[in-house]
């Protein structure tokens, strides 16, 4: 797969992205090695690296092109991205690569670093601090917007239902240094979100989803007839000391 942003590597891509790298996902086949006429290489061996974000394997340029590379992997049913645009631009103007999960013909490899649907785009819309108690305690409220681009109506319904059921759920605030991937999309080391979540589950470190509203975008305004669009607005709160 040609990628001018790569220096010192050649890329061999799978037809689906992104690869699952979380070993805490039950039943998921986490790819850690690939095979070919060169034998079998594990991640990191002879300079080989698995780019989980882009669903591909990177080799040093000395490896060459035109080889047959195979491996067994699980890929995400829905990709998740940090949104850099407004919901309006995501829904009405942006174009995406449809990476079908439902036995439609494969039309080509997903471009490197491109947004691939089905996907959910996450953005922080507003943050507000309200006085909570004497001694410098504040209730921090964060409004989070989700834009869901699904492949089928059923997939969209399932996403919206799961989100609606997440009211009153909580999740930990993580440090930046726990991000599992390096700049090339490879694992820094093993990754299990459930284990990391347990390490940060102190009650003072938890955000709670206190409100969630979901909706669908009408067919007449969809960016593509093959994409089903939904929106979700969440309010998450955390009691904390800010001074």
Please state what every model-predicted region is.
Residues 72, 143-149, 233-237:
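Residue-level recognition of well-ordered beta-strand positions that form the cores
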């Amino acid at each position: 797969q040609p990628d001018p942003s790569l220096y010192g590597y050649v890329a061999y891509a799978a037809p689906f992205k992104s690869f699952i790298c979380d070993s805490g996902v039950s039943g998921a086949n986490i790819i850690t090695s690939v095979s070919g006429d060169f034998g079998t290489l594990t991640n990191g061996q002879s300079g080989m690296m698995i780019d989980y974000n882009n669903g591909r394997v990177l080799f040093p340029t000395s490896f060459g092109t035109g080889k047959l590379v195979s491996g067994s992997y699980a890929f995400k049913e829905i990709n998740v991205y940090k949104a850099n645009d407004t919901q309006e631009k995501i829904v009405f103007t942006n174009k995406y690569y449809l990476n079908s999960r439902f036995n439609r013909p494969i039309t080509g490899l997903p471009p490197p670093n491109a947004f691939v649907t089905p996907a959910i785009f996450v953005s922080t819309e507003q943050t507000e601090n309200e006085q909570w108690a004497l001694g410098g305690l504040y209730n921090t409220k964060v409004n989070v917007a989700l834009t869901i681009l699904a492949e089928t109506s059923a997939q969209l319904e399932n996403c919206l239902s799961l989100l609606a059921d997440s009211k009153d759920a909580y999740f930990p605030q993580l440090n930046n240094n726990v991000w599992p991937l390096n700049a090339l999309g490879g694992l820094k080391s093993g990754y299990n979100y459930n284990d990391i979540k347990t390490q940060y589950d102190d009650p003072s470190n938890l955000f709670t989803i206190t409100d969630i509203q979901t909706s669908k975008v009408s067919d007449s305004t969809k960016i593509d007839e093959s994409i089903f669009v939904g929106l979700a607005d969440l309010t998450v709160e955390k009691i904390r000391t800010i001074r």
